[in-house]
From Swiss-Prot:
Transmembrane segments: none annotated. The gene is fusA. Keywords: Cytoplasm, Elongation factor, GTP-binding, Nucleotide-binding, Protein biosynthesis. GO terms for molecular function: GTP binding; GTPase activity; guanosine tetraphosphate binding; translation elongation factor activity. Catalyzes the GTP-dependent ribosomal translocation step during translation elongation. During this step, the ribosome changes from the pre-translocational (PRE) to the post-translocational (POST) state as the newly formed A-site-bound peptidyl-tRNA and P-site-bound deacylated tRNA move to the P and E sites, respectively. Catalyzes the coordinated movement of the two tRNA molecules, the mRNA and conformational changes in the ribosome. It comes from Shewanella oneidensis (strain ATCC 700550 / JCM 31522 / CIP 106686 / LMG 19005 / NCIMB 14063 / MR-1). This is Elongation factor G 1. It is found in: Cytoplasm. Belongs to the TRAFAC class translation factor GTPase superfamily. Classic translation factor GTPase family. EF-G/EF-2 subfamily. InterPro entries: EFG_II (IPR041095), EFG_III (IPR009022), EFG_III/V (IPR035647), EFG_IV (IPR047872), EFG_V (IPR035649), EFG_V-like (IPR000640), EFTu-like_2 (IPR004161), G_TR_CS (IPR031157).
């Protein structure tokens, strides 16, 4: 079966934004104009097509990124048909992992900002993640019809707060209730969309007289930005004072794909203005899979290899999301980087080192699907029938094995105990948690050995609320939820040498293991490092991994209060063995004993997770909010002025002090303030707090 759309006409994009910037409405309009969705789904009716989990429809926020395939021929039918695969990403701070996971498989992104509130804390997080994966992006400043909307102010914030070179390719005509359309700064014409047919048709008009000077100044800025793409263009621009429309577009596209500039558009998705032009910009300025560098991976011989976006290359794909569907079971969303995959064929999971067979392949449209015979380089689809695959695994061809770059997932910072309400719920709860953990790598499940309670950990209170909610709805499991627990950690601040000796003689064969370890603090975030410095075979080579294992097991259980130990460098430098009595078990125990003894002498400290908190509040409540943050041991780092008498407070606060903050903040400010928080780092817990925690756990 030949390819239906050439790969040059593919666009794999994500739509990313802050919680209330209007991203889902924007996606809905995209589906409407591309002819897929006949009735526009409004978020405030709970009818949006991409928000297909029930909780999302209730909360009006997007949690899981559904992948949707659509086609676009241009606002004026000026292009040959392009295939646009859209990954809808969540905007809530507890779900940044979903965003990161989607950005990983995209070639470009549309970042939506609210015209009134501009660059918000979460927008900065998403922007940083897009920078990390070098995703070319364009900006859509939405909600231009809202009170306080100001396109140029948002562009300025993108330049100052996000440090991006932002080049507007449009200018709004009017704002707030007078917002009527936009000026295309490349064509230098005004665009007015027809309200009678929900913006399906439009007309080009002359630029309103009062905006001519402004538009010309911005057009000049845009042409200069285009001219900087190459020396030839710059020479032509300096000689002739202008460039052709085609030259401008080609140059802006090249600079966008190189991540040198970010183009900005504006509109109001809700009022059906501007989204059509964003789709044109996606086609004209964002990359096709062949325009971005080939993905890198590691082959069987630990050598770096590349996989180009080519149907004739060996098959390689990345599983970036697992979802449970009530009708077909597990859906594995994959991005195909190279080669071809046919339904019913076998694939090799190079991370798990297992072979699997793909049952069916489906292309998703928000919540319905079409069956496909095959997928090719550049495609995003869902595979049915894969049992062992988890997020981040690579699927490849058995003869050309490769592991594509693994995704790094953050450690969860909050834990709660859950217990089933009845015996019937108990068995179902295990299955439900197992499935949810397979879908979401930032969610962990474990059993507390002492109390045999089931503990679930995640990125924030909302994250765990939704997990508990999904257990109830999707799996019919009723459970009681305990009080949230903070994920404390331990580390050492001093260096020390310690001996671990395990000897047992009780008739017959004994046990003998003896090691000397040097413990020292490692750099923050560097984790555990084991160095083998044994010379002359005083500890035989085959027992060294056992020493390492013993140390790691002791690290999991801590030395002060039973919390895992972070950032320690351990050097095994001496020891001894017995020809008959030494074995792996004995050295494992010796390693564990040596570490425990050394860590207790190496100035051990308790670490607590600290969160980066941003509170947006009306000015008259600022004193109360700051006072409350100080009482919570918060460190105020700075304040910014928002729009219309709003203050934005930046603080670092220990997580243990933030439980129930949402309710307290609401009552202190009559519901007018909002906050966002994300994990920042671990810091030493104050002595009085550390003492109380250690005593409560001993």
């Amino acid at each position: 079966m030949a390819r239906t759309t050439p790969i040059e006409r593919y666009r794999n994009i994500g739509i990313c934004a802050h919680v209330d910037a209007g991203k889902t409405t924007t996606t809905e309009r995209v589906l409407f104009y591309t002819g897929l969705s006949h009735k526009i789904g409004e978020v405030h009716d709970g009818a949006a097509t991409t928000d297909w989990m029930v909780q999302e429809q209730e909360r009006g926020i997007t949690i899981t990124s559904a992948a949707v395939t659509t086609f676009w021929r241009g606002m004026d039918a000026q292009f040959t048909e392009h295939r646009i695969n859209i990954i809808d990403t969540p905007g809530h701070v507890d779900f940044t992992i979903e965003v990161e996971r989607s950005l990983r498989v995209l070639d470009g992104a549309v970042v939506v900002f609210c015209g009134a509130s501009g660059v918000e804390p979460q927008s900065e997080t998403v922007w940083r993640q897009a920078d990390k994966y070098r995703v070319p992006r364009i900006v859509f400043v939405n909600k231009m019809d809202r009170a306080g909307a100001d396109f140029e102010r948002v562009v300025k914030q993108i330049r100052t707060r996000l440090g991006a070179t932002c080049v507007p390719i449009q200018l709004n005509i009017g704002a707030e209730e007078n917002f009527t359309g936009v000026i295309d700064l490349i064509k230098m014409k005004a665009i007015n969309w027809n309200e009678a047919d929900q913006g399906m048709t439009f007309s080009y008009e002359a630029i309103p007289a009062h905006l001519t000077a402004k538009a010309e100044e911005m057009h000049e800025f845009l042409v200069e930005a285009a001219a900087e793409a190459s020396d030839e263009l710059m020479d032509k621009y300096l000689e002739e004072g202008t460039l052709s429309e085609e030259e401008i577009k080609k140059a802006l596209r090249q600079r966008t794909i190189n991540n040198e500039i970010v183009l900005a558009t504006c509109g109001s998705a809700f009022k059906n203005k501007g989204v059509q032009a964003v789709l044109d910009a996606v086609v004209e300025f964002l990359p096709a899979p062949v325009d971005v560098p080939p993905i890198k991976g590691i082959d069987d011989n630990e050598q770096e290899v590349e996989r180009p976006s080519d149907d004739n290359a060996p098959f390689a794909a990345l599983a970036f999301k697992i979802a449970t569907d009530p009708f077909v079971g597990t859906l594995t969303f994959i991005r195909v980087y190279s080669g071809v995959l046919e339904s019913g064929s076998g694939v090799y999971n190079s991370v798990k080192q297992k072979r699997e067979r793909i049952g069916r392949i489906v292309q998703m449209h928000a919540n319905d699907r079409t069956e496909l015979k095959e997928v090719r380089a550049g495609d995003i689809a869902a595979a049915i029938g894969l049992k062992e695959v988890t997020t981040g695994d690579t699927l490849c061809d058995n003869d050309h094995k490769v592991i594509l770059e693994r995704m790094e997932f953050p450690e969860p910072v909050i834990t709660i105990a859950v217990e089933p309400k009845s015996k019937a719920d108990q068995d179902k709860m295990g299955i439900a948690l197992q499935k949810l953990a397979a879908e979401d790598p930032s969610f962990r499940v474990e059993t507390d050995e002492e109390s045999s309670q089931t503990l679930i950990s995640g990125m924030g209170e909302l994250h765990l609320d939704i997990i508990v909610d999904r257990m109830r709805r999707e799996f019919g499991v009723e459970c009681n939820v305990g009080k949230p627990q903070v994920a404390y950690r331990e580390t050492i601040r001093g260096s020390v040498e310690a001996e671990g000796k395990f000897v047992r003689q009780s008739g017959g064969r004994g046990q003998f293991g003896h090691v000397w370890l040097k413990l020292e603090p490692n750099e923050e975030g560097a984790g555990y490092e084991f160095i083998n410095a044994i010379v002359g075979g005083v500890v035989p080579r085959e027992f060294i991994p056992a020493v390492d294992k013993g140390i790691q097991e002791q690290m999991k259980n801590g030395v002060l209060a039973g919390f895992p130990v972070l950032d320690v460098k351990v050097t095994l430098f001496d020891g001894s063995y017995h020809d008959v009595d030494s074995n792996e078990m004995a050295f494992k125990i010796a390693g564990s004993m040596g570490f425990k003894k050394g860590a207790l002498e190496a100035k051990p400290v308790l670490l607590e997770p600290c969160m980066k908190v941003e509170v947006t509040t009306p000015e008259n409540y600022m004193g109360d909010v700051v006072g409350d943050l100080n009482r919570r041991r918060g460190l105020i780092e700075g304040m910014d002025d928002g729009f219309g008498g709003i203050k934005i407070i930046h603080a670092v606060v220990p997580l243990s002090e933030m439980f129930g903050y949402a309710t307290d903040l609401r009552s202190a400010t009559q519901g007018r303030a909002s906050y966002s928080m994300e994990f920042l780092k671990y810091t030493d817990a104050p002595q009085n707090i550390a003492k109380a925690i250690i005593e409560s756990r001993s």
